[in-house]
């Protein structure tokens, strides 16, 4: 029993130090309430791919890029969150289900890298993009990063934003901050929706 407690303590210590070392995008909180907050982000650089062979395939393509599979063979620090969103025609209502349209997964590059400094991907499935800054309504939740959990919190956020008369201008974005080795009850996830 004592060995188990020591091992668990070590795991939590290790997890806390790893999580603290990962860069996250900076933002300014514009407003907050008990359910969500509105944040303002600057432009960010990301590498992205279309998820045509599942979530794990997309993740591995992006992970290979930051591990050195790029034109300069440069290893790039992992950042958080990893985001997933649906790429839709903006004439379609943004309340459509998450699985309609093509799924896009993004890794944000460290803030020290500018667009012209980002090494180009070797894979044609990847592209370097500028994610425009702006205001996002964000709801935080813990637990597994499942579609069901994401959809539940997306629906809550969309409903509350409608009640608060905040106009959304894009689909819900799933933001995952922790890896699969993090205990599910300690995992941090967010739903982000761009607002006017």
Predicted region positions:
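A solvent-exposed interaction/effector surface
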Residues: 2-196
């Amino acid at each position: 029993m004592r060995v188990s407690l020591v091992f668990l303590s070590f795991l939590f210590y290790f997890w806390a130090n790893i999580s603290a070392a990962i860069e996250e995008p900076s933002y300014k909180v514009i407003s907050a309430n008990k359910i969500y907050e509105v944040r303002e982000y600057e432009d960010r650089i990301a590498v992205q791919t279309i998820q045509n062979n599942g979530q794990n395939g997309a993740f591995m393509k992006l992970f290979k890029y930051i591990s050195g599979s790029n034109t300069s063979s440069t290893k790039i620090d992992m950042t958080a969150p990893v985001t997933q969103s649906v790429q839709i025609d903006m004439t379609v209502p943004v309340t459509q289900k998450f699985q309609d349209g093509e799924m896009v997964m993004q890794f944000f590059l460290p803030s020290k890298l500018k667009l012209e400094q980002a090494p180009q991907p070797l894979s044609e499935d990847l592209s370097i993009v500028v994610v425009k800054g702006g205001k996002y309504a964000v709801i935080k939740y813990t637990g597994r990063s499942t579609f069901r959990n994401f959809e539940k919190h997306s629906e809550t956020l969309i409903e509350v934003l409608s009640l608060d008369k905040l106009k959304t201008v894009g689909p819900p974005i799933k933001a995952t901050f922790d890896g699969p080795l993090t205990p599910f009850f300690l995992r941090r996830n967010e739903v982000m929706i761009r607002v006017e």
